[in-house]
UniProtKB/Swiss-Prot annotation:
Cell wall formation. PANTHER family: UDP-N-ACETYLMURAMATE--L-ALANINE LIGASE, UDP-N-ACETYLMURAMATE--L-ALANINE LIGASE-RELATED. Transmembrane segments: none annotated. NCBIfam families: murC. The gene is murC. Pfam families: Mur_ligase (PF01225), Mur_ligase_C (PF02875), Mur_ligase_M (PF08245). Gene3D superfamilies: Mur ligase, C-terminal domain, Mur-like, catalytic domain, NAD(P)-binding Rossmann-like Domain. It comes from the Bacteria. ATP binds at G112, T113, H114, G115, K116, T117, T118. One of its GO terms (cellular component) is cytoplasm. This is UDP-N-acetylmuramate--L-alanine ligase.
Length: 468
């Protein structure tokens, strides 16, 4: 891809989708600059790798750039975007730049409403264990790599494909994984589930004729689109008819044990015993997707099993922050703290089920910050149902993510609905800054505290650890 444009500037370089692309381009030898509203571990890492990172957005930041990259989170009136257009500098959407990266290698793209980051990470890990040395660009920090991107020397690039803004339709992979299809980011699809499903069909149709669609057989919406996918299909899941099928699934603390049965065209392959270093049935499905890809690419069974057994996880995906002391005033003892990115009811239910499976005899305390008023409105009853499944709930105000407040779709409304449902008496903490102390005031010996959300609540586990 090396050509006359040598200097590429990223507006919002600290974002999960932007930073990985920037890092790969840095390693390809490009001059990378970028800006973000605040310094973070991500911006510091990129600066340490050689990027010039500015805090704050100003027109001067784009000086010398041959192109600037933006995400859908960057508004058109951003001063850097305005300056670039005035200077005739190409403004490139993030997904287009990712598509350009994928042209350098054979692309494996992971799409789906839930589980993309973990599945992408698992696929990258099993390919690495099979000595395929993949490049990867992931929406979360792969713990074993210490980063969310890496430039490998192998022929494959594994990427997370974003359906939230339909930008995954810019990608041209040779393998496409669809983990599930759920009603989220529906503003993009005119609140029409049929349009959402059509987008996923189009995603698979962008595969070449020799490509492969790897589809989850356990998801009803994915099953609905299968008749319209005209590329070779490999299915995976716990369903009896899946080509790559998990059987005899057992939880063992925070690990899952299961056997994989596989079909290679009409031939049955030997069973594969897996011990997955992640909890929950949803992660069994994510691992089965990785097994399906690895099997198709010829990764040895021993390498697949080793990669899944030693998988160290992804940042903020059921991350065990540690064991912390309960204040003496509350009887002492210890509690377990889990950090998780989940913000949709389906994701939340899966994470809570994983916590129950890992610690069946302990109280599960959920500290949750809703993300976006529109999602809270659209999924309100589902949020009430899922929140009611925890043993105790601490609830904050909605993280707006730039949206204006909506009547009856805020944190207080959720708290009221939980009380009316009678399942639970939530503790409402209006300011998320007060949540770390609220957790310590509430927790008791043996509790498992799951801190969950996609907004500013991400800082809470670290603050709880400092206060404990």
């Amino acid at each position: 891809m090396k050509h006359r444009i040598q200097h590429i500037h990223f507006v919002g370089i600290g974002g999960s989708g932007m930073s990985g692309i920037a890092e790969v381009l840095l390693n390809l030898g490009y001059t990378i600059s970028g800006s973000d509203l605040q310094e973070s571990a991500v911006t510091r890492r990129l600066a340490g790798l050689g990027a010039h990172v500015a805090i704050g957005h100003t027109a001067a930041n784009v000086a010398g750039a041959g192109a600037i990259v933006t995400s859908t989170a960057v508004a058109g009136d951003n001063p850097e975007v305005i300056a670039a257009r005035a200077a005739g500098i190409p403004v490139v959407p993030r997904a287009i730049m990712l598509a350009e990266l994928m042209r350098l290698k054979r692309g494996i793209a992971v799409a789906g409403t839930h589980g993309k980051t973990t599945t992408t990470s698992l696929v990258a890990s099993v390919l690495a264990a099979g000595d395929l040395d993949p490049t990867f660009v992931i929406g979360g920090r792969l713990t074993s790599a210490g980063a969310n991107a890496r430039l490998g020397q192998g022929e494959y690039i594994v990427v997370e494909a974003d359906e939230s803004d339909a930008s995954f339709l810019n990608l041209l992979p040779v393998m496409a994984i669809v983990t599930n299809i759920d009603a989220d980011h529906m503003d993009t699809y005119g609140h029409d589930v049929a349009r959402l499903k059509s987008a996923f069909i189009e995603f698979t149709q962008r595969l070449p004729f020799y490509g492969s669609a790897v589809l989850c057989a356990d998801d009803a919406n994915v099953r609905e689109i299968m008749p319209f996918v005209s590329r070779p299909i490999t299915t995976y899941g716990l369903s009896p008819d899946a080509h790559v099928r998990g059987e005899n699934v057992q939880a063992d603390g925070t690990r899952m044990r299961f056997t994989v049965q596989r079909q290679d065209r009409a031939t049955a392959l030997p069973p594969l015993a897996i011990e997955l270093n992640l909890p929950g049935l949803h992660n069994v499905r994510n691992a089965l997707a990785a097994v399906a890809v690895a099997t198709e690419l010829g990764v040895p069974d021993e390498a697949i099993a080793q990669a899944l057994a030693s998988f160290k996880g992804v940042g903020r995906r059921f991350t065990q922050t540690g064991e912390f002391p309960v204040p003496a005033a509350h009887g002492g003892g210890t509690f377990t703290l889990i950090d998780d990115y989940g913000h949709h009811p389906v994701e939340m239910a899966a994470t809570l089920a994983a916590a129950r499976g890992a610690w069946p005899d302990r109280r599960i305390v959920l500290a949750f910050q809703p993300h976006r008023y529109t999602r809270t409105r659209d999924c309100f009853e589902d949020f009430v149902r899922v929140l009611g499944g925890a043993d105790a709930v601490l609830l904050t105000e909605v993280y707006a993510a730039g949206e204006p407040p909506l009547v009856a779709a805020d944190g207080r409304a959720l708290a009221r609905a939980l009380r009316v449902a009678g399942r639970i008496e939530p503790v409402f903490v209006e300011d998320v800054a007060d949540l770390p102390q609220a957790v310590l005031d509430f927790v008791r010996d043996g509790d498992v505290v799951v801190v969950m959300g996609a907004g500013s609540i991400s800082k809470v586990p670290g603050l709880v650890g400092e206060l404990a």
